[in-house]
């Protein structure tokens, strides 16, 4: 077998590393891919420029990684599931208004998954602790800018949303990402308020957009006075961000 000179000097160091891995993990077998770093760079370039379409669902990998982070910090699984359903219903029903796409939908899902992880550190500073956890944790598949957007949406879920100069001073966030953060925050606030008690009282939520009015009709057999009251508190910011009216009521009532 003929080995190129530029690769020959790498053989011994690689063998040492591989041997150590085998000994540390007591591996019985070792699988080595037949690709190099350059292959990965070429593939990434081709996919981003739409020269080829990936058959692997990388977004699912990102969501799995985010769920593992939420699990590590003991986030409420049922609360997250309920809040995610509501957030995605609102997102999908307002596509014509907000202009966001598939990638932004993914960022919203991750924000919901991680919005409560700060409780593991402090019950009084949940939003700030969640922000710091997200910014300190690498999530494979997300850029630093995307993590900043997610972390900021989580931070302003319960904090007053500042002006661009104020947020930019701390995060160096672009205007485009500032607007994206505002949109995700507005949706996250509404979705989180729908399960503020963490009891999953809302059986179903009918979201309809008509003539720039978003109707939220809550279906529940339980008392949802707390949730509807909190929705009114989040209404003003949502209307300001999206430029539409928000009408909320319980099913069967006018």
Language model segments and positions:
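A short, charged
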Residues: 74-81, 239-254
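Helical "lid/coupling" subdomains associated with nucleotide-phosphate turnover
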Residues: 4-189, 195-198, 209-212, 216, ...
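Flexible glycine-/small-residue-rich
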Residues: 112, 218-220, 250
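C-terminal amphipathic alpha-helical interaction region
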Residues: 168-169, 201, 248, 252-253
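Low-complexity, glycine/alanine/valine/leucine- and proline-rich hydrophobic stretches
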Residues: 194-246
């Amino acid at each position: 077998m003929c080995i190129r000179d530029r690769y020959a000097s790498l053989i011994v160091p690689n063998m040492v590393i591989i041997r150590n891995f085998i000994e540390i993990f007591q591996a019985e077998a070792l699988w080595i891919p037949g690709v190099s770093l350059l292959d990965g760079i070429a593939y990434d370039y081709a996919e981003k420029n739409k020269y080829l379409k990936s058959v692997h669902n990388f977004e699912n990998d990102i969501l799995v990684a985010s769920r593992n982070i939420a699990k590590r910090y003991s986030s409420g699984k049922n609360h997250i599931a309920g809040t995610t359903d509501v957030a995605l219903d609102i997102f999908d029903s307002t596509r014509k208004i907000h202009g966001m796409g598939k990638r932004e939908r993914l960022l919203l899902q991750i924000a919901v998954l991680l919005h409560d992880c700060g409780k593991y550190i402090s019950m009084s500073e949940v939003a700030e602790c969640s922000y710091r956890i997200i910014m300190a944790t690498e999530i494979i598949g997300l850029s630093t800018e995307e993590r900043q957007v997610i972390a900021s949406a989580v931070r302003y879920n319960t904090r007053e949303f500042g002006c661009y100069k104020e947020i930019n001073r701390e995060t160096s966030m672009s205007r485009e990402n500032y607007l994206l953060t505002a949109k995700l925050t507005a949706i996250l606030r509404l979705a989180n308020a729908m399960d503020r008690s963490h009891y999953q009282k809302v059986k179903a939520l009918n979201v309809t957009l008509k003539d720039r009015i978003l109707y939220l009709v809550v279906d529940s057999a339980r008392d949802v006075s707390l949730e509807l009251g909190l929705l009114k508190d989040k209404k003003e910011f949502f209307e300001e961000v999206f430029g539409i009216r928000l009408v909320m009521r319980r099913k069967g009532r006018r």
